[in-house]
């Protein structure tokens, strides 16, 4: 990445688009401490988080999803949600070894109902379809009620007929939990309908930033992202 600089306001939803290799995932991994930047700084709620570990970020209220699903196949979907919330307080080992916290059961049940996963809530997550695991993975990111959520390709693997429903879910969570979202997504229509502000990256740089229609109609974006 080179010269990438932007801010996200409390409660704001920002979309990041761009062709493969544009630096979107590198951006996420840098924020999450998976990659240490060679220069530049990142700040969250006034604190310098450059190079901070994923656990430390989680405890400061940063949630995330990755392209690789984070569900534990041997645990029920419901228990996956509960231990995801425990990570915020106790750290990553709790996701593997801690007994489920009964006090989080009601919160998990509410999230399961919101995502329409009641029928599979008590099944091992590994037995669910990819789309169901994807929804569970997204739900897990919201269990600790984070202040900032980084969503990497939330539409990937989701039935096209459910994409609009996923958008409504994210808007609902944004309204009810009040956190900020940064969303990476190849589905431009999804981003344009979800995010009031869109950033287009190309070759590690910000090519365009602004309102959805302004970015969509930018000739440089059309050439770089759509190949026209």
Which sequence ranges carry the predicted segments?
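Conserved ABC nucleotide-binding domain
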Residues: 50-51, 111-129
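Catalytic Walker B motif of ABC-type/P-loop ATPase nucleotide-binding domains
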Residues: 149-153
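The feature captures the beta-strand-to-loop junction immediately N-terminal to the Walker
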Residues: 17-19
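Conserved ABC transporter NBD signature motif
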Residues: 40-47, 60
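Conserved catalytic motifs of ABC-family nucleotide-binding domains
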Residues: 145
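Helix-to-loop junction immediately C-terminal to a conserved catalytic motif
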Residues: 32
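Conserved ABC ATPase "signature" region
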Residues: 89, 94-120, 161, 168-171
């Amino acid at each position: 990445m080179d010269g990438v600089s932007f801010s996200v306001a409390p409660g704001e939803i920002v979309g990041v688009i761009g062709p493969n290799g544009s630096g979107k995932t590198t951006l996420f991994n840098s924020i999450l401490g998976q990659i240490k930047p060679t220069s530049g700084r990142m700040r969250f709620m006034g604190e310098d988080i450059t190079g901070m570990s994923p656990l430390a970020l989680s405890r400061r209220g940063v949630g995330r999803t990755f392209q690789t699903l984070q569900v534990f196949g041997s645990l029920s979907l419901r228990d996956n949600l509960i231990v995801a919330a425990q990570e915020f307080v106790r750290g990553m080992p709790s996701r593997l070894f801690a007994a489920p916290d009964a006090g989080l059961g009601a919160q998990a049940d509410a999230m399961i109902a919101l995502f329409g996963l009641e029928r599979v809530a008590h099944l091992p997550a590994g037995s669910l379809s990819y789309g169901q695991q994807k929804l569970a993975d997204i739900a897990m990111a919201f269990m600790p009620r984070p202040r900032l959520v980084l969503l990497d390709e939330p539409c990937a693997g989701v039935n096209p007929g459910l994409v609009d429903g996923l958008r409504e879910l994210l808007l609902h969570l944004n309204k009810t939990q009040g956190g900020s979202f940064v969303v990476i997504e190849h589905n431009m229509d999804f981003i344009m309908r979800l995010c009031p502000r869109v950033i287009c990256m190309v070759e590690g740089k910000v090519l365009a930033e602004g309102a959805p229609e302004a970015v969509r109609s930018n000739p440089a974006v059309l050439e770089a992202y759509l190949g026209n």
